[in-house]
Structure formats: structure tokens, C-alpha cells
Amino acid sequence: MLYYAKIVREKGDLRNLLNAAIDITAMVYDGEDDVPTILDKSEKRIMEAASHQNTSDFTPIGDIVLSTIDKINTVYEAHGGLTGIPTDFTDLDNLTSGLQPSDLILVAARPSMGKTAFTLNIAANVAIRAKKTVAFFSLEMSKNQLMQRMLCSEASLDSQKARVGELTNEEWNRLIGMGEIIGKAPIYIDDTAGIQINELRSKARRLKSQHGLDLIIIDYLQLMQGSNTKNSGDNRQAEIAEISRSLKALARELNVPIIALSQLSRSVENRQVKKPMLSDLRESGSLEQDADIVMFLYREDYYDPQTTNQNITEVIIAKHRNGPVDTVKLYFKKEYTRFDNLSKMQ
């Protein structure tokens, strides 16, 4: 019986692959899309066939009820614990219950607020301490620059001293020791400048297939290109909207959280109150619409050096589709470009 069941299953797989091949051939002959788009759609179609997926299928509501109750029961059994991936920032995790699968999380701030440092800290915490696989797409910094930042941050080393070669022997030992730890962590870095959304999506799919994937981080969204590079300069808002929608769709397809860094418009600098608002998101209202969570980073000491709130960064949760909005505070160690729980510093 098992032998015949195996034959039936294999025939079904072959039929799925044949249908995928027919669809791909039709796309090539139609000529409606450019080559990168056809490659992206072809890869997705083959992966669907290989994993027995069919995106057009309806699901009986009874099945949805059962899976939803199972999810609620999992939360109940956690007794208030985290249901997502921990960032290791306690107050933030308590607010979000961790990074949730299929969520698109936007982290936005003006320059010099620590966006890259914040997400590098999250990447290290998730990969080293939670043992989860992280894909980091760095469009602004090279992989070596990014790794130097992570090494100094995790080893509590002054990044400026590392840049100018003034580390002591003891600091060198700490750097090497941390290098051994980070070198074993499941972090994968891609530093393709101006990467297209199709290419990013393809790389993320392959990484998930080959090594597993739990979290994607993109630094930063406005440096990405849409799928149609020929007309990318015509309407930047429409291009950002396409990228935003595609990232949300990718988060759902791979069932992983995606953290995308974003710039804020200069209008923040032109008003008396500098704290960011949702209307400050640069280039497209679709960013606010597509994101499940919007976080703003704000440091009062950046604008007011005399403030008593030195080294305090506010993480403002301005949108939270499935939870409360609030503000949590972290301690920012500038010399290490590292964030820590505020309670740890008190």
C-alpha cells in the first residue's frame, strides 16, 4: 500500500512541475514582463510546485477555526511569554511579544539616530542568543563595515579606536574572542548596492530553502529598486509602494518577520517638536499602510545636548496592527554603537 501511495504522490509532484513548466513557457512567449520579473515568477512557481502549494486554493473555514484555536492555545500555554522571536530588548519584547512571523516591521528615524546599530543589535541577539537564522541585506554599508560594527558592539569596544588601529592587547583578545562567537552564528549578509526587489526576494527564498530563515533585515528600504528599473525614475512614490507591498507579500510567503529600515522626511527638522510621526514617513503613504508595526527611534540629546536624558533612545511604536502602541526606552552606548535595556544600566 505504501508503495502505491508513493507512486501516486510522485505522479502528483510531476504533474505539478509540468503545470509550472507550462506556465513558465507561456510567460516567456507572452513577452509581457522583463527577464528579471519572469525569473522571479518562474522561481516562485517552481517552489510552489515543489512544496505542494497552490495559492489559488480556498481553505474550508473549519480548518481555519482549528488552526486559529491552536494558535490561541499556544499563546495561553505560554502564560504571557513571548510568541515570536525575542529581540533581547525586554520592554520591546513585552510590548510586541517578540518579532511575529509574516510581520513587516518598519524602523524609521532621521540620520544619526542609530537605525543600523539598532537592527545590527537585533540581528546579533536573534542569531547568537536565540539561535535563529538571520538574513541581513545591507544596501548602504559593505559587509566588512557592517561586521566591524557588529564585532565592536558585541565586544564592547570603541569603534573609533578600532577604525584607527588603537586597540590594546586586551581589546584585541576580546575582539578575536567575539569573532569566534559571531563566526558560528547563523547570520548571512548580502551587500548588493541598489538591489532590486525581485533579486532580494529570490535570494531570500534560496536562503530559506538551503539553510532555513527566521528573520530578514533590510538597511534601508529607500535604496532598493522596484522590479521595473526602466521606469524607476518616473514615479518614485509608486516604486516605493511596489517595494513595500512586495516586502509584505514576501513576509507572508516565507512566514518570517521582515524589518525594513526607512528614512524620514526633512519636515521633522522644520518643526519645534522633533519626535517623528507617521506623516513623516518618506516618499509613500503605502509604507504606513503595508507595515504591521512602525517604530520610530528618537534621541532627545541629539537635538538638545544639555538635556538630562543623555544616551536615552525612545523607541516609539506608532503603529501596531495586532497590539498596543506605546514608547519604550533603551540606553544607547555611542562609543560601542550598542543599545541595551535601560533597566540594565540603572
Where do the model's predicted regions map?
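Non-catalytic, usually N-terminal nucleic-acid engagement modules in DNA/RNA processing proteins
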Residues: 92, 219, 292
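Flexible beta-alpha connector loops of hexameric P-loop NTPases
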Residues: 159-168, 188-194, 225-241, 268-279
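The Walker A/P-loop phosphate-binding site
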Residues: 56-157, 176-177, 184, 345-346
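Short, small/acidic-rich helices and loops at N termini and domain boundaries
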Residues: 1-78, 82, 113, 132, ...
